[in-house]
Curated annotation (Swiss-Prot):
Coiled coil: none annotated. It comes from the Eukaryota. This is Uncharacterized protein At4g10930. Residues 466-485 have a biased composition (Polar residues). Residues 486-496, 641-651, 679-692 have a biased composition (Basic and acidic residues). Residues 450-465 have a biased composition (Low complexity). Residues 422-496, 622-697, 755-786 are annotated as: Disordered.
Length: 984
């Protein structure tokens, strides 16, 4: 029969599945539901593949009368046992005749078939080898049985994947056609003999006996039809031929002579090994259930040669086949087209290709392993020739049983030193001989305290290279230095010292941890400075943050507030000594719980700080805390009447200090002491008072030698309102700010004679005095006069009465630079007129911030400086004044309207800012002076950019920006970083 290595993946899988059921010798009843396929591989790797090509599916019903006897002949040992498939003895001539019969059978499925007719028996001869030997060295016992057991499978997919019947598969002698009747009669006789023993064999097939028999040809031929014992008519050949035509038999045999010899050698070696093991006495087996001799021999054999020989490479065929399996892409595609092509030239499906590769991969490639023979030879030689060595080796391994965990315990390789060898366990077998050096597990625990006691010196020593013995510090133990010397002397020991390296790395980490713990016990300087009571607590009692539902508050902020709460609760306890007690533990626990509740409720950092401060105020009972809460209990911004300061007390340093503490001074809180003007909040009422008592002439200020006007102005150098060199020359003090684009100018009118030429002033003194007397002269705190009505006289030059009235009704709108240049022309005249225009705008600007002392003071100083410049340019001033008419001056009602209009916008802005940061003041995060300073600065900054606004609608669009600006000023006030801005 022609040999073709063709099979299917399904057949291979089924052979494994069914063989698992029959590996104990049990027979399995064949119940088929449709097409089937049988794959049988015997002991010599000969495969019999049977599949249906054109079978009759209508006759594939289940049958209970088809026996499946399998006889498994067991040898003395289960390891050497192999199953023999008993086949009927038929000569080669009968097989050839049957092949010829199959060739002549018709393929028409529509031919007459009788359901009651007997089935012809188609037999395929399995070549009987004289000495079948199983190669069992690469398979387990069950796998060996599975390999030799008949595999039966019922599947409906076989008809889809099976190939068409080829005449070459069943080719035989064409001249033996006269022997067909004889073959058929012999088949029928055999069938009748089999059916007579139906009942007994059927029961045997279900019993799990070890001596059951299987007729492989009944599996191959059986279709599950009912057998009729009374009808054995040989005349109905068409149905028999049709049924036989549905079977395709392939015998695949690949058993080279070298493999047969290797299998015989393997079997011989195994028998010798068993005999050597059986010579052991029973006492040794009782002492140890595992055979120590065999175990040591197998260990030595599996480990391979101890010399530096290169490992034996696998065979070239195995490597080539493996590459072929793993190779993908075009190369594999072209190869498979050539290798797995059909007879018609078409390529087989991937299913068939993979099936064939899997079949031969498991049967042929793995079977040719000379390493197995070498392993068995080495085991046998160790058992026979070296019994003493195995005993000594085993005796050296027995101490591991007393402490087995150390032989399996590996230290993590976290060291920074290079690794020259693989990691070793703590208790390596080779280190057991000299237990004094390496073997004791207690040495690790002894070495760690010694190294950790060195603290900082051990860190330095571990940082240096360990293999240099001369770089040992004083704190390093003598053990480590001696070990390092040994490492230098014996380079081979470097590979075995991973454990000591790991110990030193652990010691370094432990030393660092010890330093941290001592610092915690002593208390960090930050805790001592800010939280003295908390610093006295033991380190394990200090509060730690509880987990919150969200992370909207930074951890650093939470930790600070937790310390603050704990410190406050410890103060509340009034303990003489801070130690571990019920009171301290309760205070710490309360602080942790309170902080966690606040953190869960808070949606932002500001809210969190507010709630923490409220909680501290709520728990406060001491007198100092009550005194601190009292100014917060009332409204943070008291009524303007209670905040008014009379001019009589303005020079008193005690009053100034009180005003500064209350936040009513112009300077920010906590600023250094200096002579500061204390200005009332509402400038209009103070102006009314000073008009009655102030001097009539502006130049009478010379009679008051101590009078001075201080103020800080920030001018952008690139702004159009910057006065330039004239202002800088006349300034008494000029101080640069942090940024290069700003200049801080302090204006003074103490000695106007220094800055003015007396001859220039006397020239037009009468005209100037007359015009100034007609205006409303303001005095602030009895120190300075401010001309209020010079602007309309200057405006009369170009615009007339309508311009003044329009500006009065419009809320004090400031003219732009372009308008000023149109009205008054470029050059030096602009220095005269523009300050007067902006001085007129003071009616609106000053009224916008009556509650902010800093802003009003700034504007008044601005007006005073304008008056000084007016005196400088006095020659040109009368020309513009002479052109003005008294009727063009705005009335007091118009000025009142402008004041009220600007005042309302400023009040709205200020109220908006107060509403945002008032909770911080009430809760104690910032005090009153910081609160007032932040409100003043924020309002001043906002109104600087919205000075022309006619309504407060810009708060809708820019509310968030204003809030952020206010928060920045609050942070500046609380940190004290703003002091340098105000210090001189």
């Amino acid at each position: 029969m022609e040999t073709q290595p063709d099979t299917s993946l399904m057949e291979t899988r089924k052979s494994l599945d069914i063989s698992e059921k029959t590996n104990s010798g049990c027979s399995v009843e064949a119940v088929y539901s449709g097409n089937f396929s049988v794959t049988v591989a015997d002991d010599g790797e000969t495969a019999l593949v049977v599949s249906i090509v054109k079978g009759d599916e209508s006759h594939m019903g289940p049958s209970d009368t088809n026996p499946l006897p399998v006889q498994a002949k067991m040898d003395g040992d289960p390891d050497s046992s192999h199953l023999k498939i008993l086949c009927r003895e038929e000569n080669t001539e009968q097989v050839a005749v049957k092949s010829e019969l199959n060739q002549s059978l018709p393929h028409d499925i529509s031919s007459r078939l009788s359901s009651d007719s007997d089935q012809p028996f188609f037999a395929a001869d399995i070549e009987n080898r004289a000495d079948p030997v199983v190669e069992k060295d690469c398979l387990s016992i069950d796998d060996k049985k599975n390999l030799s057991t008949a595999a039966i499978s019922n599947s409906d997919v076989a008809s889809v994947i099976s190939l068409k019947r080829k005449h070459s598969d069943c080719s035989g002698d064409d001249g033996n056609s006269e022997t067909k009747p004889e073959i058929y009669e012999s088949l029928n006789e055999l069938k009748l003999e089999e059916e007579e023993e139906l009942t007994t064999v059927h029961h045997e097939s279900r019993s799990p006996s070890n001596n059951t028999t299987v007729d492989i040809f009944s599996i191959v031929k059986g279709t599950g039809r009912r057998k009729n014992l009374m009808r054995s008519n040989p005349t109905d050949k068409s149905s028999e031929a049709e049924n036989a035509a549905g079977l395709r038999v392939k015998k695949i045999k690949r058993t080279p002579e070298d493999e047969k010899e290797s299998m015989v050698l393997v079997e011989k070696l195994r028998k010798e090994i068993r005999e050597a093991v059986r010579n052991k006495s029973m006492e040794d087996i009782r002492e140890n259930q595992f055979d120590p001799k065999l175990l040591a021999a197998f260990r030595a054999a599996v480990a391979g040669p101890k010399t530096g020989e290169a490992p034996r490479r696998s065979s070239a065929l195995a490597v080539k086949a493996k590459k072929l399996m793993l190779q993908k892409g075009k190369v594999r595609e072209n190869l498979t087209k050539k290798i797995y092509a059909d007879l018609n030239g078409k390529r087989k499906s991937a299913w068939h290709r993979d099936c064939e590769v899997e079949f031969w991969k498991h049967r042929c490639i793995q079977g040719r392993k000379p390493e197995k023979i070498e392993t068995l030879k080495s085991v046998l030689s160790l058992l026979k020739n070296k019994p003493a060595d195995t005993k000594t080796n085993f005796s050296s391994e027995t101490p591991q049983a007393s402490n087995p965990i150390l032989s399996r315990l590996y230290l993590a390789d976290t060291s920074v030193f290079p690794r020259n060898d693989n990691l070793k366990p703590l208790l390596a077998p080779k280190e057991m001989g000299n237990s004094q050096n390496n073997g004791k597990p207690t040495e690790a625990s002894k070495t760690l305290p010694k190294i950790s006691a060195a603290k900082g010196s051990s860190v330095k020593a571990a940082g240096s290279k360990l293999n240099s013995g001369n770089k040992q510090s004083d704190g390093q133990p003598n053990l480590t230095s001696s070990n390092s010397k040994e490492m230098v002397e014996n380079p081979d020991d470097l590979k075995k010292d991973k454990r000591k390296w790991a110990l030193q790395v652990l010691a370094r980490k432990k030393a660092l941890a010890g330093n941290n713990s001592t610092q915690d016990k002593e208390g960090s300087p930050e805790l001592k400075g800010n939280y003295p009571l908390l610093a006295q607590l033991p380190a394990d009692m200090r509060p730690s943050l509880a987990t919150s539902r969200h992370n909207k508050v930074p951890v650093a902020v939470r930790q600070t507030q937790l310390y603050r709460l704990t410190e406050h609760l410890l103060k509340k306890e009034n303990l003489l000594t801070i130690r571990r007690s019920a009171a301290t533990e309760l205070a710490v626990a309360d602080a942790i719980n309170i902080e966690k509740a606040i953190a869960d409720k808070s949606s932002s950092k500001v809210v969190y700080l507010n709630l923490c401060s409220q909680e501290i105020l709520h728990h406060s009972e001491s007198k100092t805390m009550d005194n601190a809460v009292e100014p917060n209990s009332s409204s943070p911004m008291a009524d303007s009447e209670s905040e008014r300061i009379s001019s009589k007390d303005s020079d008193n340093p005690a009053v100034l200090e009180a005003l500064r503490a209350a936040g009513l001074a112009d300077s920010p809180p906590n600023s250094p002491t200096r002579s500061v003007e204390v200005l009332p909040e509402k400038g209009d009422s103070s102006l009314d008072k000073t008009r009655e008592t102030g001097p009539y002439n502006v130049f009478d200020m010379d009679s008051v030698p101590d009078t001075d006007i201080f103020g800080d102005f920030e001018y952008e150098l690139d702004e159009e309102d910057y006065f330039g060199a004239t202002m800088a020359k006349k300034a008494s003090v000029m101080q640069p700010d942090e940024s290069l684009t700003k200049v801080k100018v302090v204006l003074s009118t103490v000695q106007p004679g220094k800055s003015l030429n007396p001859s220039e002033v006397v020239e037009d003194e009468e005209t100037t005095t007359e015009n100034l007397n007609e205006t409303t002269n303001g005095k602030e705190d009895g120190k300075s006069f401010v001309p209020m009505e010079l602007v309309p006289e200057a405006e009369g030059e170009g615009e007339g009465e309508g311009e003044g009235e329009g500006e009065g009704e419009g809320g004090g709108e400031i003219l732009s630079v372009a308008e000023c240049e149109e009205l008054y022309g470029p050059g030096t005249e602009k220095l005269v007129e523009r300050p007067l225009i902006e001085g007129f705008a003071e009616n609106g600007v000053k009224a916008k911030a009556p509650d902010s002392e800093c802003e009003s003071n700034t504007q008044r100083e601005f007006i005073a400086s304008n008056f000084e410049i007016t005196c400088i340019q006095e020659k040109k001033l009368p020309r513009s004044i002479q052109k003005c008419k008294p009727s063009e001056k705005p009335s007091k009602e118009e000025k009142g309207k402008a004041d009220g209009f600007g005042n309302s916008i400023t009040k709205k802005v200020e109220a908006y800012i107060k509403e945002h940061i008032r909770p911080l003041c009430k809760s104690g995060v910032i005090n009153v002076e910081q609160y007032r300073w932040a409100v003043t600065k924020t309002t001043e900054k906002v109104m600087k950019y919205h000075s022309k606004a006619k309504s407060a609608n810009f708060l809708i669009k820019e509310g968030d920006k204003i809030k952020k600006l206010a928060e920045q000023y609050v942070e500046t006030a609380s940190s004290g970083a703003h002091h340098k801005d105000k210090c001189k």
